[in-house]
Amino acid sequence: MTAAAATVTVAAVQPTPVFLDRDATVERLVASIDEAAASGAQLVVFPEAIVPGYPDWVWRTRAWADQSWYRRLWEQAVDIPGPVTDALGSAARRAGVWLAVGVNERVPSGTLYNTLLYIGPDGAVAGVHRKLMPTGGERTVWG
């Protein structure tokens, strides 16, 4: 006899980030988490690097042509743990959902990582996965 598979309701959410504005983007994510949970989602998934936005200039400019973009990304990147994980954790706990959120993570050494952040329904960071082999122009920004 086999056990019945559990059904999990997943919400794939793609709100527009407020580009290079971490706090405003997180506010949008929190609203989306609440909406997805109200619709029955148990797992809410967001895109790659949504906080504070994907650095798409890497595909349009010469490498290192304009350091101001990198500096702005660094200033708005996410510390783990930190205020962003606290805000997302509170939203996950309130909604009772799992989260998978793509962020630009900064570390004290000065490196930025394209990171997937997992947060459990208890509000705690359950896991962190860094994209360690960025491709093409992404290598001028991440890891």
Report the location of each language-model feature.
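N-terminal phosphate-binding loop and adjacent alpha-helix
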Residues: Q14-S32
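A short acidic, glycine-rich active-site loop
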Residues: Q67-D86
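Short, basic and Ser/Thr-rich N-terminal targeting/leader segments
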Residues: A6, S39, R93-L99, G110-Y113
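Active-site catalytic loop in hydrolytic enzyme cores
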Residues: A3, I80, T85-D86, S90, ...
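Active-site-proximal beta-strand elements of phosphoester/diester hydrolases
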Residues: T7-F19, T115, V128-R130
